Curated annotation (Swiss-Prot):
Its main location: host cell. Belongs to the herpesviruses U21 family. It comes from Human herpesvirus 6A (strain Uganda-1102). The chain crosses the membrane at residues 365-385. The gene is U21. Glycans are attached at residue 164. This is Glycoprotein U21.
C-alpha cells in the first residue's frame, strides 16, 4: 500500500509541483495518537540542511509504545520500530530514486528552487501516513505551511467507512490546494486496493514480528511488545534555555518495576544522547557505572517532537540510586536528572576509565594506611610483651626466628648484632656470631 502511495506521488510530481509554495513550519505534528492495536507507518520528504539534498524520513509505531524514526541509511537495532522502518526503507530507497529521476527537467528545476528557498533547518515538505486497526483505517497526506506568520498544517485524510467499504474525504486546510486535490483524486481510484492492503497489514505485521523476534531474542531474552505500564512518579528538567526536556520516570509493569529516561525536543533524535547510571559497590567504595539499556529515538507524529529514550529494569540492579544524563552531542552541554524517590549526592562520580584510575589510587592509599597501622600495632604489641618477659628474650626470639627462616640473612644479622649489641655476649653466643 505504501508503495502505491509513493508511486502516486511520482505521477503527481511528473504532472505538476508537489512542494508547497512557501517554507514549511518545523515541529508541527498531527493531533491524533495511535491507540493500542494500531499500526502507523509514515514516510516524509524533507531537505537536509547540511547536504542540501532532499531525503526521506520514515517512522513506525505500534501500540503507542514501540516506535522509531530514521533516515534512509538507518541501521537495524533490536527495537521493533527500528526494524519496521528498516524494512520500509529497503523499498522506499528505490522508490525515492525513481521519484526524483523520472520527472521532467522543468519540474525538477522548480522542485530544487523550492528546496533552496527553505534553508532554515530540517523541514517536512510532504508526509504520507497509513494507519490500520480493527476499528479504524485511514490514510493521511500532510503538508507543512506558514501563512500570516502563523504555523499551520494543511491536511487531508480519507477514512474508511466500514458500512460500505468506501472512503470518506476529510479536508482540513484553508483555501484550495490543487496539488493536494489532484493527488487525492488519484488515490480515490485505488480504493479497493487500499482497503485490501490495509486489511492485510495486520498479517504482514505478524510475519515481520515473528522474523524480528528471531533476530532480537539473542539480545533481549524477554521481549515484551504489548506491555501497558502505569507511571508511578517522574522528575524532569529543562535543558538550558532551549525547549528541550530531560525526564526520568519510574514505571510499574506486569513484570516488575522499570525506569524510563526520555530526552525530547526538536533535533534530539539526531543530536541527543542519553546515558543511565546506577550506583554500584566496588571493593572499598561506591561508584557510578553505566547501565545497559534498551533505547530508541524518533521524530513521529505520536509525540509531535523528537524523542530519544532508554529503558532499564530496576529489579536487576542492587543499587538504590540512579540518574540519567542527557547530552547535546553538538554543543557538549548536559543535564542530570535523578530518579524520583531516590536522593543522589551533589557530587556524582561516574565510573569510567578515569574514575577507575582514581579508584586504584584510593585503594593503594588505603592499603598503605593499613600497612602503617599494622606496623604500629606490632610495635605496641612488642613493647607490651616486653613488660612481662623482658626485652632481651623478645629480641633474641626475633633474631633466632629470622636466622632460622632465612639463612641467607647471616651476614645482615652479624652486622646488626655487631653494631647494636657489641656488649651482649648472650646474643652473640646464641647466634654463633
Amino acid at each position: 500500500m505504501m508503495i502505491c502511495l509513493v508511486f502516486l506521488c511520482v505521477l503527481t510530481l511528473a504532472r505538476g509541483e508537489i512542494y508547497p509554495p512557501i517554507c514549511p513550519a518545523p515541529g508541527v505534528g498531527n493531533d491524533e495518537a495511535v491507540r493500542a492495536g494500531e499500526l502507523l507507518l509514515e514516510i516524509s520528504a524533507y531537505r537536509n540542511q547540511r547536504s542540501g539534498r532532499v531525503e526521506l524520513w520514515g517512522s513506525a509505531a505500534v501500540n503507542n509504545q514501540v516506535f522509531y524514526g530514521g533516515m534512509e541509511n538507518s541501521q537495524i537495532d533490536y527495537d521493533f520500530g527500528k526494524f519496521l522502518v528498516f524494512r520500509c526503507f529497503q523499498v522506499f530507497n528505490n522508490v525515492h530514486k525513481l521519484l526524483f529521476n523520472t520527472v521532467s527537467s522543468a519540474t525538477m528545476h522548480l522542485a530544487r528552487k523550492r528546496v533552496q528557498k527553505c534553508g532554515h533547518g530540517k523541514m517536512t515538505f510532504i508526509s504520507i501516513q497509513v494507519q490500520c486497526s480493527v476499528n479504524k483505517k485511514s490514510i493521511r497526506l500532510s503538508r507543512m505551511s506558514e501563512a500570516s506568520l502563523k504555523k499551520q498544517v494543511l491536511r487531508v485524510a480519507f477514512f474508511l467507512d466500514r458500512n460500505n467499504n468506501s472512503w470518506i474525504a476529510d479536508k482540513n486546510f484553508q483555501g484550495e490546494d490543487r496539488t493536494m486535490l489532484r493527488l487525492w483524486n488519484e488515490l480515490s481510484t485505488y480504493q479497493q486496493y487500499l482497503i485490501s492492503s490495509c486489511n492485510n497489514d495486520v498479517k504482514i505485521l505478524s510475519e515481520l514480528y515473528g522474523e524480528f523476534r528471531q533476530i532480537a531474542l539473542p539480545y533481549d531474552e524477554k521481549l515484551n511488545l504489548n506491555f501497558m505500564p502505569v507511571i508511578r512518579s517522574s522528575s524532569e528538567r529543562l535543558f538550558r534555555a532551549d525547549d528541550l526536556k530531560c525526564s526520568f520516570s519510574r514505571w510499574l509493569g506486569a513484570e516488575g518495576e522499570f525506569a524510563v529516561c526520555e530526552y525530547s525536543g526538536w533535533g534530539v533524535s539526531r543530536l541527543g544522547k542519553i546515558e543511565i547510571f546506577a550506583e554500584k559497590p566496588l571493593t572499598f567504595d561506591m561508584a557510578w557505572k553505566t547501565v545497559k539499556m534498551r533505547s530508541s529515538g524518533a521524530y513521529t507524529s505520536l509525540f509531535r517532537d523528537d524523542v530519544t529514550w532508554g529503558l532499564i529494569p530496576l529489579d536487576k540492579w542492587v543499587g538504590d540510586k540512579y540518574f540519567c544524563m542527557c547530552t547535546n552531542k553538538e554543543s557538549g552541554d548536559n543535564v542530570i536528572v535523578t530518579l524520583p524517590e531516590k536522593n543522589v549526592e551533589k557530587s556524582i562520580q561516574i565510573y569510567d576509565e578515569g574514575s577507575a584510575m582514581l579508584s586504584f589510587a584510593e585503594m593503594t592509599s588505603i592499603i598503605l594506611n593499613l600497612m602503617f597501622m599494622g606496623a604500629v600495632a606490632v610495635s605496641v604489641g612488642i613493647l607490651g610483651i616486653s613488660c612481662f618477659v623482658g626485652l632481651k628474650e623478645i629480641i633474641y626470639f626475633i633474631f633466632v626466628s629470622v636466622d632460622y627462616m632465612w639463612p641467607f640473612c647471616d651476614t645482615l644479622l652479624t652486622t646488626a648484632v655487631n653494631c647494636f649489641f657489641k656488649g651482649r655476649t648472650f646474643l652473640r653466643r646464641e647466634l654463633k656470631i
